[in-house]
A protein has these predicted regions:
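Short terminal hydrophobic/aromatic SLiMs and anchors at protein ends
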Residues: 1-2, 9, 22-25
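Ala/Thr-enriched low-complexity intrinsically disordered regions
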Residues: 3-4, 13, 17
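Hydrophobic residues within membrane-embedded alpha helices
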Residues: 7-11, 38
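Intrinsically disordered, low-complexity polyampholyte segments enriched for Lys and acidic residues
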Residues: 10-13, 28
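Bacterial N-terminal signal peptides that target proteins for export
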Residues: 21-34
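N-terminal signal peptide c-region/cleavage motif recognized by signal peptidases
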Residues: 42-44
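Tandem repeat scaffolds
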Residues: 46-190
């Protein structure tokens, strides 16, 4: 996250932890080459990454590792290409998010509502999704290597091409909504 102060800075949005953020003004001439370079190289848009967590927020190519969004409402948010490694989303409302190509490795998303979420090609390596609701979620080509999905609801989820190696599905409600995976369901529902 950007945090700066001094001449040429304007008070920005409140960050995920409730801290005020200061973002350099584009009027500050020495900053223009830096901003243009980041835009041309596809770097993060600072204003968007500093936006407060809220329904429909757009965070693209942001670095939000270790952030705590527990209990927050991010319904319908655009989180594409963003890194949330080791972030906390316990009991967060994430229904309808687009987290395609995002990184949630080691994130704690236990009891989160991910109904209808798009998580195509998303890295969920060792993520904790215990008791999470993933009804109708699109997890095509997602990496769920050693993810904890114990007790999760996967009714209607799409897992085509997903890496499920070592994922724990014990007690999870499987794709058809009828089958409950048995204890020790590692890598597949048994």
């Amino acid at each position: 996250m950007l945090a700066a102060s001094g001449p040429g800075c304007k008070r920005g949005a409140v960050g995920p932890a409730g801290r005020s953020l200061y973002i350099h003004s584009v009027i500050n001439l020495p900053r223009i080459p830096l901003l243009l370079g980041l835009l041309l190289l596809g770097g993060p848009a600072f204003g968007a990454c500093a936006d407060s967590p809220a329904p429909g927020v757009v965070w693209r190519r942001c670095l939000l590792d270790n952030a705590d969004f527990s209990g927050r409402d991010l319904t319908g948010a655009i989180l594409r290409d963003t890194s949330f490694a080791r972030a906390r989303f316990v009991e967060a409302k994430l229904a309808g998010i687009d987290g395609s190509d995002a990184r949630f490795s080691f994130a704690d998303m236990s009891r989160a509502d991910l109904t209808g979420a798009t998580l195509r090609s998303t890295d969920l390596t060792r993520a904790v999704l215990a008791a999470a609701t993933l009804k109708g979620a699109d997890l095509r080509r997602a990496t769920l290597f050693r993810a904890d999905l114990r007790g999760a609801d996967l009714t209607g989820a799409e897992l085509t091409g997903a890496n499920l190696s070592g994922a724990d599905f014990s007690g999870a409600r499987w794709l058809d909504g009828e089958k409950i995976c048995g204890a020790g369901s590692i890598g597949s529902c048994q």
